[in-house]
Amino acid sequence: MSHRAVWLPAGLTILLLGCRHQTEQYVLPDQVTDFSALYASNCAGCHGQDGRSGPARPLNDPLFLAVIGKERLRDVIANGVPGKAMPAFAQSAGGTLTDQQISIVASEVEARWSRPQEFVGVALPPYTAELGDAKHGAHVFRGYCARCHGEDGTGSAKGGSVVNPAYLALVSDQSLRTTVIAGRAGQGSPDWRSDEPGHAMSQQEISDVVAWLSAQRPLPGEMAKGGATAP
């Protein structure tokens, strides 16, 4: 018997074993239950590989997680934010993730990045609230925000514009409120407690400044007609 005759069945056996091994490792998309895999394929592109440094709201933010709460976080992941950049991921809402996968993502984000002990005894502002008084919000903005964003919100050497029409068209009123409350630590933006001890914003002031920011959003068609201002 030739060496070739011996190696042929042996090579075929190895090939078949390799194929079977690959088949056994394949997992259907709706059966993936590993958080790292789910996060990498669905969340990291906007929220960053480690929950930070992405274009969207950081998830690796204990204050944000404390304010939004577990149930609301799961709801946003499942149903998204209509009309904005956050899509719905639940299959029941047109997404690709099962209810089990939604729960895995939400619970693991909480388990890995929340720090509830840091907020014991802290009166956190409510995640949602009605818009307040925009006129008074202008005064609040000048007191808390103008130092970095300019008196009219168009920006300064310390911070960018928060009234850019393109920006306001992309974010919801809830997103504005979340940013006012939780800040953006990675960008040097303080939370509602301000960077001055004892000078925290009241719940009414939060609602008022969000109302003022919302009032700067152009009406449909105005941005296309007038053009977006530079940030």
Predicted feature locations:
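Gly/Gly-Pro-rich "capping" loops immediately C-terminal to redox-active cysteine motifs
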Residues: 32, 36, 48, 52-78, ...
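C-terminal motif of bacterial Sec signal peptides marking the signal peptidase cleavage site
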Residues: 15-18
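Flexible coil segments in periplasmic/lumen-exposed cytochrome c-class electron-transfer proteins
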Residues: 20-25, 29, 33, 40, ...
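Bacterial N-terminal signal peptides that target proteins for export
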Residues: 1-8
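Hydrophobic helical h-region of N-terminal Sec-dependent signal peptides
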Residues: 10-13
